Amino acid sequence: MSSDPRDVLLAPVISEKSYGLLDQNKYTFLVPPESNKTQIKIAVEKVFNVRVLDVNTINRQGKRKRTRRGWGQRKNTKRAIVTVAPGDRIDIFGPPVS
């Protein structure tokens, strides 16, 4: 894996569940399948300048989908749910809209 911490965090996950976890200081990111919890923690701390308390990872199996030429498969993904210290925030979704 590359030494650049920005290569570990591919994208934030935008879903109903991830929005619900924001109240608990938990942020969800897509990460490469070969990354581990230590790499994810270091990357979040360096990129966003926050203190990480906990990292939970989820390996998601790609769905089997029907195509014109038979069956295909979506790619497998890995997600990381990162808990940051109270008082720290990551503005990945922008400020709240009034």
From Swiss-Prot:
GO molecular function, one term: rRNA binding
GO cellular component: ribonucleoprotein complex; ribosome
Biological-process GO terms, alphabetical: translation
UniProt entry keywords in alphabetical sequence: Ribonucleoprotein, Ribosomal protein, RNA-binding, rRNA-binding
Signal sequence bounds: none
Superkingdom as given in the UniProt entry: Bacteria
Keyword Ribonucleoprotein: yes
UniProt similarity note: Belongs to the universal ribosomal protein uL23 family.
Subunit structure: Part of the 50S ribosomal subunit. Contacts protein L29, and trigger factor when it is bound to the ribosome.
Biological role: One of the early assembly proteins it binds 23S rRNA. One of the proteins that surrounds the polypeptide exit tunnel on the outside of the ribosome. Forms the main docking site for trigger factor binding to the ribosome.
PANTHER family linked: 60S RIBOSOMAL PROTEIN L23A (PTHR11620)
The protein's name in its UniProt record: Large ribosomal subunit protein uL23
Gene name of the encoded protein: rplW
